[in-house]
């Protein structure tokens, strides 16, 4: 168990998130999150607890289920996916944009590519630069974590998704990146 980390210690931050929450962040996401922790944390004493790290991580990357604390322009409501032959998927994603719900559809080389194309049909241009995923524990009922590095506008944003379905986790990771871009005023 990790008692506290020096602010800015990427290794301690990585180990805390791995030990406490099962997350294995890609290297560039570790670097980005370390910078966020430095920016957000009161550095009196130069240390941050695992609980403070997790709070910062959730606030930055994960949707809050409490509607009064929800941030971000986009929200994931559900999806329907159909395989249409070798390497082609059709996806319909129920999406909240601001306070309006709609369904967007796309066809692509897998569900993530189909979602990117569905977003493009609505004028939201995204380019996936990196993608990683893993199970958070062993067993059939394990949650999956997905990490996406995306170019949105001319900026790079990481997103994180956690779900029982790797497809939903992947789409949520992309929505996380979109919401971070919206928070920064890009969208």
Q: Could you say what each language-model-derived stretch is?
A:
Residues 21-22, 30, 35, 39-187:
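Polyanion-binding surfaces on beta-sheet-dominated domains and ring/shell assemblies
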Residues 17:
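Conserved, mostly hydrophobic/aromatic
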């Amino acid at each position: 168990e990790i008692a506290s980390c020096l602010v800015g210690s990427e290794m301690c931050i990585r180990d805390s998130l791995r030990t406490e929450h099962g997350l294995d962040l890609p290297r560039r996401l570790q670097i980005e999150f370390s910078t966020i922790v430095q920016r957000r944390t009161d550095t009196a004493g130069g240390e941050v607890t695992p609980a403070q790290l997790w709070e910062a991580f959730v606030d930055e990357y994960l949707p809050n289920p409490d509607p009064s604390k929800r941030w971000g322009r986009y929200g994931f409501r559900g999806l329907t996916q159909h395989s249409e032959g070798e390497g082609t998927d059709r996806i319909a994603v129920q999406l909240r944009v601001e306070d309006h719900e709609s369904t967007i559809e796309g066809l692509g080389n897998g569900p993530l590519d189909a979602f990117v194309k569905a977003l493009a049909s609505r004028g939201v241009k995204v380019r996936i630069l990196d993608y990683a995923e893993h199970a958070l524990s062993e067993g059939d009922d394990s949650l999956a974590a997905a990490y996406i590095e995306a170019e949105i506008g001319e900026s790079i944003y990481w997103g994180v998704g956690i779900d029982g379905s790797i497809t939903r986790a992947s789409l949520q990771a992309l929505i996380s990146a979109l919401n971070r871009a919206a928070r920064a005023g890009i969208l």
